[in-house]
Structures are given as C-alpha cells and as structure tokens.
C-alpha cells in the first residue's frame, strides 16, 4: 500500500475510534465536544466515496447541529470524486498541505539546545502546562479548552507520545504523537512559546517525539507542517513529503 494510503487509513481509523464520532453517509465525522477549534472537528470520506448532494446536505446539517464549521481533511487521491462534489456544493479550499513522513533509519539528530529538558507529562499540572503552551502557540488566548489536554493524555496512555519541553523549569514547548494504528502515528499539536522560538526547540522536540514513537514500536511517523518554514524544520530532521492533504470548509451560512 502506498504511504499516502497508509496515512489516510490511519486518520480514518482514529476518527472511527473516537467516542463521539458521527457517521453521515460515506463520511466519518471526528467531533470533539470539549474542543471547538476547527482542527479538532472535521470529516473524512470513506475510501473511493462518491457522495450525493443529499449526502453533503446531511453532512453540513450534522456539523451545524453540533455547532461546528462544516469541514473536511483528507488526501484527495483516496476519494477522487469528493473534492469536485464539495466545490459544487459551495465549499472553499483552505489549503493543500504537504504530508510528510519519517522512518527510523531516516531520523536525524538536531543540534542540542542549552538547558532544554524534554519529558513526558505525568501529572495534571504538567498536562495542563503542555496544553497551555499549545493553546497560546496556535494563537489562542486565555485558558485552553478541556479537549486540548485530553488529546495529550489519550496519546500518552494509548501507545502514543506526549512531551513537555522546559528551560529552567519554564514550559516552552509541547506536542504529541497520536495513538498508533498498524505502526503509524501522527506527530501533531507541536507548539513553542512565542518568546522561545527560533532557538531550535521545535526541531529538538519533534526529534524527541519521533524517536520516542520509534522506541514504542512505531514504524512511521507522519505529520502535516503548518507552513514552508515549518516544513524545512521537519525536513532537517529526516521527514520527507509523501503526499498532499486537502483542507476544505463551508463558510458559515
């Protein structure tokens, strides 16, 4: 199976395992009642899905019933008929993001960062600190929603990885690798506190998460970089492009 197909199967399987997921026609909706951010709530089409307009109307209605933006994340090659149907129904492409992956023999060690300590959160206070770094790192204000820390806890207890980076006891970075499926895990939610960026913390934290996942018998770590600069950081520790993911949504009515 090509790597991009593996990645799509991994994402779809995790969505189906999530306790609050919805099935709407040929779609699985990953719904997070405790985390309203759009990146935590999206639909994935079935392999080779060919949705009707009625299927799409039902999908939109399900999102709006749960007070979420109608949105999908998927690799277009897994269901070629879906993107044209979505565009015809008024959806707008947010972006086409590269999908990158790394195998154990490709991982490179980045330069060390002075005084940086990376460890897995163990206490509620540590998970909350990690979630706060992520929340602010992705532009949030105030306190994070409960779902942010919950995602890290689920990863840490389900065979994935969670990590909190500190410098002299101050939380400066956080991220995780999802619960694995058939040896694949997604590195996600990686964030570095604004005052500590451009010091190599992102690369160090990413390499730590990836190496730890390999140590827990994962065979591939994949991710979606946020922009070209972030992609270069991941490329510097051994990640390479394996496909492209479509992020597409319907503007509020």
Feature annotation, model-predicted:
Residues 1-10, 43-44, 48-50, 97-98, ...:
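Short amphipathic alpha-helix that is part of the acyltransferase structural core
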Residues 21-24, 84-92, 160-175:
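Conserved beta-hairpin
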Residues 53-60, 188-194, 198-215, 236:
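Conserved acetyl-CoA-binding loop-helix of GNAT-fold acetyltransferases
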Residues 143-193:
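A conserved beta-strand-loop-helix scaffold within acyl/acetyltransferase catalytic domains
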Residues 79-93, 203, 227-244:
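Conserved active-site alpha-helix within GNAT-family acetyltransferase domains
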Residues 66-75, 213-226:
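Conserved GNAT acetyl-CoA-binding A-motif
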Residues 50-125, 247-250:
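Acyl-donor-binding surface of acyltransferase catalytic domains
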Residues 1-67, 78-79, 83:
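N-terminal charged segments
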């Amino acid at each position: 199976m090509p790597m991009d197909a593996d990645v799509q199967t991994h994402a779809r399987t995790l969505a189906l395992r999530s306790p609050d997921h919805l099935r709407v026609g040929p779609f699985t909706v990953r719904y997070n009642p405790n985390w309203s951010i759009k990146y935590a709530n999206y639909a994935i089409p079935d392999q080779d899905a060919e949705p009707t307009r009625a299927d799409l109307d039902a999908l939109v209605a399900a999102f709006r019933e749960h007070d979420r933006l109608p949105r999908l994340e998927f690799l277009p090659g897994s269901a070629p008929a879906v993107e044209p149907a979505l565009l015809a129904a008024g959806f707008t492409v947010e972006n086409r993001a590269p999908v990158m992956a790394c195998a154990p023999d490709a991982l490179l060690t980045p330069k060390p960062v002075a005084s940086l300590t990376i460890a897995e959160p163990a206490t509620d206070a540590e998970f909350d600190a990690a979630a706060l770094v992520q929340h602010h790192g992705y532009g949030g204000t105030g306190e994070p929603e409960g779902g942010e820390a919950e995602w890290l806890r689920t990863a840490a207890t389900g065979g994935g990885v969670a990590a909190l980076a500190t410098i002299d006891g101050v939380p400066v970075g956080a991220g995780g690798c999802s619960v694995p499926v058939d040896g694949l895990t997604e590195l996600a939610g990686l964030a570095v506190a604004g005052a500590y960026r451009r010091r190599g913390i992102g690369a160090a934290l990413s390499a730590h998460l990836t190496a730890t996942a390999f140590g827990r018998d994962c065979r591939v770590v994949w991710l979606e970089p946020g922009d070209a600069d972030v992609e270069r950081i991941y490329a510097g520790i051994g990640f390479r492009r394996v496909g492209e993911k479509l992020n597409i949504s319907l503007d509020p009515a």
